[in-house]
Every structure is written in structure tokens, then in C-alpha cells.
Amino acid sequence: IMPFWYTLKYDGKTKKPVVADVYKTANPSVPITEPLTALRNAGMTIIPTITDGTDQMILANLLAKPVSRKQVVDAIVATVASQNYDGIDLDFEGFAFIDPNTTWKATAPNWVLFVKELSAALHAEKKILSITTPYLFNPAEAQKGYFVYAWAQIAPFIDRLRIMTYDYSTSRPGPIGPIAWTEKTVKYAISIMPASKVYLGL
């Protein structure tokens, strides 16, 4: 199970990234220990999702500097340790939908370094690293998709890739996830990593 319980924020006072607990805000009268106990008693693997709650280019700039990149890593690892989660899922959509696509080439290598460093820290504690992103296509083709997420480069470091194979049509009526479109991104994904790592969001 992958509950949306956390979001990454930037604290302007401390000038540091923080992982904010949105579960507590939404459920002030129900301690998080209650659902955690129920889920664990049911034998569930618990991998919460962290969304990107920062403003335009904030996360990209944090990942561009070794010190602040490590701060992001440390904040995420501390969140996993706080409730002994089985791992974490990153749903950082700001690169795709908030930052200008002209920044993607500069952001991608810093994203790869971040994933590599986070992976090492989590795997040292035997935790799972899952990444959720919009679609990518083969970069050799004209239509590349959201190449900022650099699937081929992060593939060795992640345990799961969750592809957002939906929202094909947004501003106008149309299909949510056409089969040909979905198959194209899946074929690319399984050409660069084991199929066992690839999950579809429908």
C-alpha cells in the first residue's frame, strides 16, 4: 500500500528542505499508529508516497547542489525511519508540470545523482525505493516524453518504476490512456530495466 501521507516542502526560515506530514493535518484525531497497526496486522508492505510541494525550480535547485541534495536525501531517509516504513515512493511531478521544459537537460543529471544517493542510503537499511513519473519514450525518437526523469540512468538504482499511464486527454474530451500510447512507454521501460520493476498507474 502506498498512502499519500507526505509532501516535500522548503522551509524559508531554516533554508532547508523538510518532509511535511499531511496525514496528521488530515486526520488530527486519529494517530498514524492506528492505520499502521491495522495495515501491518494485515501483512501489508507500507511504502508511503512523498509528493513535491515546492514552488517552481525549488527542488531542481536543491538537487543541483551537493549539500542541499544531501539534505533532501536525509529528510526522506529520516521519514522512512520515523515509522519503520518498508520504503518510500517519490512522486515529484514539479519537474514535469511546473518547471519550464527548457530546464530539463540541466535538471536530469542532478536528479540521477539524487536518486543514486537516496538509493544507497535506503538500500543500506534494506528499504525499497519507488519512483512515480509521467511517461517517457525512447530518446532516439522525435517524441521523448518527460525525459527529465532519465529512466535509463536511474534504472540501476530503483526498485520500482510507477508510470502514470493516464491523463492523455486533459483540456479536451478524449481517451485517458490509449493502448498504443501506453504500450509505447511500457516497451521503452522494459527495454532499459527488468519488467519486474515496472508498474502501471491506470
Where are these regions (language model features)?
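Glycan-recognition patch characteristic of GH18 chitinases/ENGases
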Residues: M2-I76
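Substrate-binding surface in catalytic domains of secreted glycosidases
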Residues: G12-V30, A96-L202
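Surface-exposed acidic, glycine-flexible loop patches that form ligand/cofactor-binding
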Residues: T37-A38, A78-S82, A120-A121, A189-I192
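Solvent-exposed coil/turn segments that connect beta secondary-structure elements
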Residues: Y6, M44, T51-G53, E93-F95, ...
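Structural recognition of alpha->loop->beta junctions
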Residues: K65-F92, F147-S169
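Helix C-cap/helix->beta junction micro-motif
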Residues: A42, Q83, A124-K127
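Hydrophobic faces of well-ordered beta-strands that scaffold small-molecule active sites
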Residues: I1-P3, M44-I50, I88-L90, L129-I131, ...
